[in-house]
Amino acid sequence: DQLANSIPKLLLTNKIRYVVDNLDKSFFSHDLTSHSEAEIKLFNVQFSFLAHAYVWGDENPATVLPSSISVPWKKISDLLGRPPILSYGSYCLDNWHKIVDDEEISLDNVALNYNFLAGIDEDWFVTIHVCIEDAAREAILATLSIADSFADDSINEDLSQKYLEVISTSMTVSYTHLTLPTKASV
Protein backbone atom coordinates (compact mmCIF):
# COMPACT_ATOMS: atom_id res chain seq x y z
CA ASP A 1 0.00 0.00 0.00
CA GLN A 2 2.77 2.44 0.91
CA LEU A 3 4.66 1.74 -2.31
CA ALA A 4 1.55 2.17 -4.47
CA ASN A 5 0.74 5.43 -2.68
CA SER A 6 4.29 6.64 -3.44
CA ILE A 7 3.95 6.23 -7.22
CA PRO A 8 3.33 9.95 -7.95
CA LYS A 9 6.47 10.99 -6.05
CA LEU A 10 8.53 8.15 -7.51
CA LEU A 11 7.50 9.14 -11.03
CA LEU A 12 8.17 12.80 -10.35
CA THR A 13 11.69 12.04 -9.12
CA ASN A 14 12.40 9.29 -11.70
CA LYS A 15 12.92 6.76 -8.89
CA ILE A 16 10.19 4.22 -9.69
CA ARG A 17 12.48 1.76 -11.46
CA TYR A 18 15.23 2.12 -8.88
CA VAL A 19 12.84 1.41 -6.00
CA VAL A 20 11.11 -1.52 -7.74
CA ASP A 21 14.41 -2.99 -8.95
CA ASN A 22 15.61 -3.02 -5.34
CA LEU A 23 12.56 -4.71 -3.85
CA ASP A 24 13.17 -8.01 -2.16
CA LYS A 25 11.73 -10.80 -4.31
CA SER A 26 9.51 -11.79 -1.39
CA PHE A 27 8.30 -8.29 -0.47
CA PHE A 28 4.73 -9.44 -1.20
CA SER A 29 4.29 -12.62 0.77
CA HIS A 30 0.55 -12.61 1.43
CA ASP A 31 -1.37 -15.87 1.49
CA LEU A 32 -4.02 -14.81 -1.01
CA THR A 33 -6.46 -17.51 0.11
CA SER A 34 -6.88 -15.68 3.43
CA HIS A 35 -8.03 -12.44 1.76
CA SER A 36 -11.47 -11.34 0.60
CA GLU A 37 -12.23 -10.68 -3.06
CA ALA A 38 -12.25 -6.93 -2.32
CA GLU A 39 -8.76 -7.16 -0.81
CA ILE A 40 -7.50 -9.18 -3.77
CA LYS A 41 -8.96 -6.59 -6.16
CA LEU A 42 -7.13 -3.89 -4.19
CA PHE A 43 -3.86 -5.82 -4.51
CA ASN A 44 -4.53 -6.06 -8.25
CA VAL A 45 -5.02 -2.30 -8.47
CA GLN A 46 -1.77 -1.69 -6.59
CA PHE A 47 0.27 -4.07 -8.73
CA SER A 48 -1.34 -2.77 -11.93
CA PHE A 49 -0.27 0.75 -11.05
CA LEU A 50 3.21 -0.35 -10.00
CA ALA A 51 3.76 -2.33 -13.19
CA HIS A 52 2.54 0.39 -15.51
CA ALA A 53 4.49 3.06 -13.64
CA TYR A 54 7.57 0.86 -13.96
CA VAL A 55 7.09 0.32 -17.69
CA TRP A 56 6.23 3.93 -18.60
CA GLY A 57 8.02 5.79 -15.79
CA ASP A 58 11.21 6.57 -17.68
CA GLU A 59 12.21 7.99 -21.04
CA ASN A 60 12.30 4.53 -22.64
CA PRO A 61 9.59 1.99 -21.82
CA ALA A 62 10.78 -1.07 -19.92
CA THR A 63 10.38 -4.35 -21.78
CA VAL A 64 10.64 -6.66 -18.76
CA LEU A 65 9.08 -6.44 -15.31
CA PRO A 66 11.07 -7.54 -12.27
CA SER A 67 9.81 -10.78 -10.74
CA SER A 68 9.20 -8.98 -7.43
CA ILE A 69 6.11 -7.43 -9.00
CA SER A 70 5.38 -9.61 -12.03
CA VAL A 71 5.03 -12.91 -10.15
CA PRO A 72 2.56 -11.73 -7.48
CA TRP A 73 0.66 -9.62 -10.03
CA LYS A 74 0.17 -12.66 -12.27
CA LYS A 75 -1.05 -14.77 -9.32
CA ILE A 76 -3.47 -12.06 -8.24
CA SER A 77 -4.75 -11.54 -11.79
CA ASP A 78 -5.25 -15.28 -12.24
CA LEU A 79 -7.31 -15.44 -9.04
CA LEU A 80 -9.55 -12.69 -10.41
CA GLY A 81 -9.74 -14.25 -13.88
CA ARG A 82 -8.23 -11.13 -15.43
CA PRO A 83 -5.12 -10.54 -17.50
CA PRO A 84 -2.31 -8.68 -15.73
CA ILE A 85 -2.94 -5.25 -17.25
CA LEU A 86 -4.22 -1.96 -15.91
CA SER A 87 -7.78 -2.46 -17.12
CA TYR A 88 -10.80 -0.18 -16.77
CA GLY A 89 -11.85 -2.34 -13.84
CA SER A 90 -8.55 -1.83 -12.04
CA TYR A 91 -8.06 1.82 -12.93
CA CYS A 92 -11.63 2.90 -12.26
CA LEU A 93 -14.13 0.46 -10.81
CA ASP A 94 -11.89 -1.03 -8.09
CA ASN A 95 -9.91 2.15 -7.40
CA TRP A 96 -12.16 4.61 -5.58
CA HIS A 97 -13.83 5.32 -2.27
CA LYS A 98 -16.54 7.56 -0.92
CA ILE A 99 -15.20 10.58 0.90
CA VAL A 100 -18.15 10.47 3.32
CA ASP A 101 -19.39 6.89 3.68
CA ASP A 102 -23.03 7.63 4.49
CA GLU A 103 -23.51 9.99 1.53
CA GLU A 104 -24.48 8.98 -1.99
CA ILE A 105 -21.99 8.43 -4.78
CA SER A 106 -21.59 11.81 -6.46
CA LEU A 107 -18.95 13.90 -8.14
CA ASP A 108 -18.37 15.67 -4.82
CA ASN A 109 -18.12 12.47 -2.78
CA VAL A 110 -15.82 10.16 -4.75
CA ALA A 111 -12.01 10.03 -4.68
CA LEU A 112 -9.35 7.81 -6.23
CA ASN A 113 -7.31 5.46 -4.09
CA TYR A 114 -4.29 5.37 -6.41
CA ASN A 115 -3.11 7.44 -9.35
CA PHE A 116 -0.01 8.15 -11.36
CA LEU A 117 0.61 11.87 -10.99
CA ALA A 118 -1.79 12.90 -8.19
CA GLY A 119 -3.38 15.63 -10.28
CA ILE A 120 -6.96 16.84 -10.25
CA ASP A 121 -7.32 16.08 -13.98
CA GLU A 122 -6.44 12.41 -13.52
CA ASP A 123 -8.75 12.09 -10.53
CA TRP A 124 -11.59 13.81 -12.34
CA PHE A 125 -11.16 11.73 -15.49
CA VAL A 126 -11.62 8.54 -13.48
CA THR A 127 -14.16 9.61 -10.85
CA ILE A 128 -16.59 10.88 -13.49
CA HIS A 129 -16.74 7.29 -14.77
CA VAL A 130 -17.47 5.97 -11.28
CA CYS A 131 -20.44 8.34 -11.08
CA ILE A 132 -21.67 7.45 -14.56
CA GLU A 133 -21.43 3.72 -13.76
CA ASP A 134 -23.39 4.29 -10.54
CA ALA A 135 -26.02 6.38 -12.29
CA ALA A 136 -26.42 3.69 -14.96
CA ARG A 137 -26.82 0.88 -12.42
CA GLU A 138 -30.64 0.88 -12.42
CA ALA A 139 -30.80 0.89 -16.22
CA ILE A 140 -28.43 -2.05 -16.38
CA LEU A 141 -30.46 -3.99 -13.81
CA ALA A 142 -33.71 -3.16 -15.60
CA THR A 143 -32.22 -4.22 -18.94
CA LEU A 144 -31.11 -7.54 -17.45
CA SER A 145 -34.60 -8.05 -16.07
CA ILE A 146 -36.09 -7.31 -19.49
CA ALA A 147 -33.69 -9.78 -21.11
CA ASP A 148 -34.71 -12.41 -18.54
CA SER A 149 -38.38 -11.77 -19.36
CA PHE A 150 -37.76 -12.38 -23.04
CA ALA A 151 -35.69 -15.48 -22.30
CA ASP A 152 -38.43 -16.94 -20.11
CA ASP A 153 -41.24 -16.04 -22.51
CA SER A 154 -42.95 -14.48 -19.50
CA ILE A 155 -43.38 -10.90 -20.67
CA ASN A 156 -45.78 -9.16 -18.32
CA GLU A 157 -47.11 -5.75 -17.28
CA ASP A 158 -43.89 -5.00 -15.42
CA LEU A 159 -42.01 -4.75 -18.71
CA SER A 160 -43.17 -1.19 -19.42
CA GLN A 161 -41.99 -0.17 -15.93
CA LYS A 162 -38.56 -1.64 -16.69
CA TYR A 163 -38.37 0.40 -19.89
CA LEU A 164 -39.24 3.55 -17.92
CA GLU A 165 -36.44 2.74 -15.46
CA VAL A 166 -33.99 2.47 -18.34
CA ILE A 167 -35.09 5.84 -19.74
CA SER A 168 -35.05 7.56 -16.34
CA THR A 169 -31.62 6.22 -15.47
CA SER A 170 -30.27 7.17 -18.89
CA MET A 171 -31.36 10.73 -18.21
CA THR A 172 -29.52 10.67 -14.86
CA VAL A 173 -26.38 9.38 -16.56
CA SER A 174 -26.65 12.13 -19.18
CA TYR A 175 -26.98 14.78 -16.46
CA THR A 176 -23.91 13.40 -14.67
CA HIS A 177 -21.94 13.49 -17.90
CA LEU A 178 -23.10 17.04 -18.69
CA THR A 179 -21.69 18.33 -15.38
CA LEU A 180 -18.17 17.32 -16.44
CA PRO A 181 -17.27 20.62 -18.18
CA THR A 182 -18.50 22.61 -15.17
CA LYS A 183 -16.40 20.68 -12.67
CA ALA A 184 -13.36 20.29 -14.92
CA SER A 185 -12.97 24.06 -15.19
CA VAL A 186 -12.65 24.45 -11.41
Regions found by a protein language model. Give the residues of each.
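Non-transmembrane, amphipathic alpha-helical segments
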Residues: 32-35, 39, 120-131, 155, ...
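Intrinsically disordered, low-complexity acidic/proline-rich regions
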Residues: 1-24
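Long, charged all-alpha helical bundle/coiled-coil segments in cytosolic proteins
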Residues: 24-110
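Conserved small/polar residues in nucleotide/adenosyl-binding loops
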Residues: 176-182
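Helix-boundary capping/turn motifs
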Residues: 15-18, 39-45, 134-138
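Charged, amphipathic alpha-helical oligomerization/scaffolding segments
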Residues: 127, 131-134, 138-141, 145, ...
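Short, charged/polar, low-complexity loop and linker segments
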Residues: 108-126, 142-155, 162
